[in-house]
Amino acid sequence: MANVEIRVIGNDTYRVEGTVEESEKKLSDAARSGQSRLAWFKELASGEPVGINPAHVVSLRTV
């Protein structure tokens, strides 16, 4: 499976499981659901869930 790096405002990055397309869909779905809705991913480094606010995402890229 591909991995994606999500960069957010403040230059923090999260490496998560999935493809760019899957990540973009999760972020898009969360953005359409409301302002306080987070997109949930599994972080590669820790294996823990991480919630990301779609309004804070700067870029996505495959790693």
Where are these predicted regions, by residue range?
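Eukaryotic intrinsically disordered, low-complexity regulatory linkers and tails enriched in Ser/Thr/Pro
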Residues: 1-63
